[in-house]
Amino acid sequence: MDTLCSTLLLLTIPSWVLSQITLKESGPTLVKPTQTLTLTCTFSGFSLSTSGVGVGWIRQPPGKALEWLALIYWDDDKRYSPSLKSRLTITKDTSKNQVVLTMTNMDPVDTATYYCAHR
């Protein structure tokens, strides 16, 4: 009976729940001080044209907590970390399913692993 119930429940899950969302970051692994970092997030499994959807960037310096950087919404509304706002630009290209983050005037304190995320 348990197997039958599990099977029936699985069959009633909407198809959108089963779709797979993927995001992949790309860009240079090393940037010299004062240079500009440009990172690209290429995604699939959702549309950045859909109301309520956003893609953001976060980073994690070695041995430290995650830090939120920027977020862009379907309607092109953009939000930035107040402490980094003057150095960040976030843009989207819905035709390519990409979001690009640019960070100017890089410094050794910006050493981190950078991630993009779906909202």
UniProtKB/Swiss-Prot annotation:
- Region annotation (Complementarity-determining-3) maps to 117-119
According to its record, what are the GO cellular component terms?
A: extracellular region; immunoglobulin complex; plasma membrane
Region annotation Framework-2: where it falls in the sequence: 55-71
Which GO molecular function annotation, any one, does this entry have?
antigen binding
Which region ranges are annotated with the description Complementarity-determining-2? 72-78
Residue span of the signal peptide, if any? Answer: 1-19
Q: Which PROSITE patterns match?
A: IG_LIKE
Q: What is its main location?
A: secreted
Q: Which Pfam families match?
A: V-set
Mark the residues carrying the PTM Pyrrolidone carboxylic acid: Q20
List every stretch annotated Framework-3.
79-116
- Which GO BP terms sit in this record? immune response; immunoglobulin mediated immune response
User: Where is it localised?
Assistant: Secreted; Cell membrane
Q: Which UniProt keywords apply?
A: Adaptive immunity, Cell membrane, Disulfide bond, Immunity, Immunoglobulin, Immunoglobulin domain, Membrane, Pyrrolidone carboxylic acid, Secreted, Signal
Tell me yes or no: is NAD among this UniProt entry's keywords.
Answer: no
Region annotated Framework-1 sits at 20-44
Q: Which SMART domains match?
A: IGv
Q: Name which cysteines form disulfide bonds.
A: C41-C116
Residue stretches making up the Ig-like domain = 20-119
| PANTHER family membership | IMMUNOGLOBULIN HEAVY CHAIN
Assembly with partners or alone? Immunoglobulins are composed of two identical heavy chains and two identical light chains; disulfide-linked.
Q: Give a short account of what the protein does.
A: V region of the variable domain of immunoglobulin heavy chains that participates in the antigen recognition. Immunoglobulins, also known as antibodies, are membrane-bound or secreted glycoproteins produced by B lymphocytes. In the recognition phase of humoral immunity, the membrane-bound immunoglobulins serve as receptors which, upon binding of a specific antigen, trigger the clonal expansion and differentiation of B lymphocytes into immunoglobulins-secreting plasma cells.
What is the official name of this protein in its record? Answer: Immunoglobulin heavy variable 2-5
Tell me the classification of the organism that encodes this protein.
Eukaryota, Metazoa, Chordata, Craniata, Vertebrata
